[in-house]
Structures are given as structure tokens and as C-alpha cells.
Amino acid sequence: PPTTFYGSSLTEGSIISDGCVVNDGAKIVDSVIGPCTVIAKNVELDGTVIVGRDEIMKRTQAEQDIGEGTVIRRCIVDSDAMIGANVRILNEAGVQNIDRSEDGYVISDGIVTILGGATIPDGFII
């Protein structure tokens, strides 16, 4: 199915694949969004690659790949990862390399990668 936009969203310099759902208030800049990704309200993505899902999953309204109010910059989100609400993935500390696989992410050359299948809880800050 085609991507569905609900409400008012801003997209600039981005590619959004088929089967996505983008909710009201989302801001997607210089990013690539893979298939079947559900983005909640008021999410900000900048310079982010979301691999997406291999297949469309039946979800309730509460189930989203990127939770409400989350801000992500310069990040790769591998397939089937789930990111909670009000998460901030900004690497404001400027960490260059760290392996936090047990927490579902690694940082390599300053780029945060959320590992495939990982779940990042609500309010988490990287």
C-alpha cells in the first residue's frame, strides 16, 4: 500500500518508502524511511536512515516504530527496531565509538546505530 500521512507533516530532502504511516506534526529532513515504518505524532528525524520492516504487520494505534515526541539525528535504525516515546538520539556528548549492544545500540565514527530488533524504551537519551 502507499504511504499514508495523517494531519500536517513536514518532509524535506527525504525518501519515504511504501506502506509507511506518518502522523501529525512529524518533521522528516534529509532522511530515508524504509517500508512499513509507523512514525508517531511530533517526531523529528534529521539525517536518519530507518531500514523499516520486511512485511506489513497488523498494529494497534499504540504500536509504532518511532514513538511520539521522539527526536533522532544522524542515526541508522536497523530493521524491526522499536523506539519509544520521547526518546532523544542526538549524541550530544559527541561520543565517537562505543558498543552498547546490551542496550540495543552502538556508536561508530559518531553515528548512532540502533540494532535490528532492539527496543529503545520511552524517555531514553543517547
Task: Please place each PLM-identified region on the residue numbering.
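Left-handed beta-helix
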Residues: 1-126
